[in-house]
């Protein structure tokens, strides 16, 4: 069972429809017990970083997400949800994040239209489980004005938008997509299927303990 965290700032319906399409068992929830009982977690998000962190604090979800991130349970952040995984953001004000990944969220300063909205090529950097069946140079769908300034060793996908935008990051059980896999057609569905596979593998490992 995958828990989609509903904290009032996510593109919940599109993520829900995508998981339904790939045949994944899921629940939409902000209940800590349900999230803890899940086999994997998706943290979506659209909006401002400081407001999102305030809401997660109000719902007492920050420490729980940090505990999940430090366990081996698969966690996928999407768009703003990915940005929240980092140490802090410069959006509107300096604001601490979940600190599960090293790096800072900074505003895009490029000679192009902001937000970066639409399809862009994703160049793979290294291999991870979520790349199975995903071709290098596939196009994915973005909507964002900020990007992750982070170490190269956690970057597994890059798009060019005047700067090298980390489109996909990963460290251990933690994954983050700056783009929207649920809006990225067959490629996005394949990545979500791969995440589902990672979740199922983790679940099987827990049953054997």
Swiss-Prot record:
Glutamine amidotransferase type-1 domain sequence ranges: 1-205
Catalytic site positions: 79, 180, 182
GO CC field: cytoplasm
Major location category of this protein: cytoplasm
Pathway terms, separated by semicolons: Amino-acid biosynthesis; L-histidine biosynthesis; L-histidine from 5-phospho-alpha-D-ribose 1-diphosphate: step 5/9
Reactions catalysed, as given in the entry: 5-[(5-phospho-1-deoxy-D-ribulos-1-ylimino)methylamino]-1-(5-phospho-beta-D-ribosyl)imidazole-4-carboxamide + L-glutamine = D-erythro-1-(imidazol-4-yl)glycerol 3-phosphate + 5-amino-1-(5-phospho-beta-D-ribosyl)imidazole-4-carboxamide + L-glutamate + H(+); L-glutamine + H2O = L-glutamate + NH4(+)
A Pfam family the protein falls into: GATase
UniProt-listed Enzyme Commission number(s): 4.3.2.10, 3.5.1.2
SUPFAM superfamilies: Class I glutamine amidotransferase-like
GO BP term (any one): L-histidine biosynthetic process
Keyword field: Amino-acid biosynthesis, Cytoplasm, Glutamine amidotransferase, Histidine biosynthesis, Hydrolase, Lyase
InterPro entries xrefs: Class_I_gatase-like, GATASE, Imidazole-glycPsynth_HisH
Localization: Cytoplasm
HAMAP family (alphabetical): HisH (MF_00278)
NCBIfam families: IMP_synth_hisH (TIGR01855)
UniProt function note: IGPS catalyzes the conversion of PRFAR and glutamine to IGP, AICAR and glutamate. The HisH subunit catalyzes the hydrolysis of glutamine to glutamate and ammonia as part of the synthesis of IGP and AICAR. The resulting ammonia molecule is channeled to the active site of HisF.
Name of the protein in its database record: Imidazole glycerol phosphate synthase subunit HisH
Gene: hisH
């Amino acid at each position: 069972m995958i828990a989609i965290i509903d904290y009032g700032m996510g593109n919940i319906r599109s993520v829900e429809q995508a998981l339904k399409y790939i045949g994944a068992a899921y629940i939409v929830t902000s209940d800590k017990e349900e999230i803890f009982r899940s086999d994997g977690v998706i943290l979506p998000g659209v909006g401002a970083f400081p407001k999102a962190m305030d809401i997660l604090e109000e719902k007492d979800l920050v420490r729980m997400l940090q505990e999940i991130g430090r366990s081996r349970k698969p966690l996928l952040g999407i768009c703003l949800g990915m940005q929240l995984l980092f140490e802090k953001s410069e959006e509107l004000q300096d604001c601490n994040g979940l600190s599960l990944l090293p790096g800072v969220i900074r505003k895009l300063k490029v000679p192009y239209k902001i937000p970066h909205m639409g399809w862009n090529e994703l160049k793979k950097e290294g291999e991870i489980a979520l790349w199975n069946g995903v071709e290098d140079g596939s196009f994915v769908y973005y909507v964002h004005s900020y990007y992750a300034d982070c170490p190269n060793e956690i970057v597994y996908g890059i798009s060019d938008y005047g700067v090298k935008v980390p489109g996909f990051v990963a460290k251990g059980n933690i994954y983050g997509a700056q783009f929207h896999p649920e809006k990225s057609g067959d490629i996005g569905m394949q990545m979500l299927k791969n995440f589902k596979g990672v979740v199922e593998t983790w679940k099987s490992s827990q049953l054997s303990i």
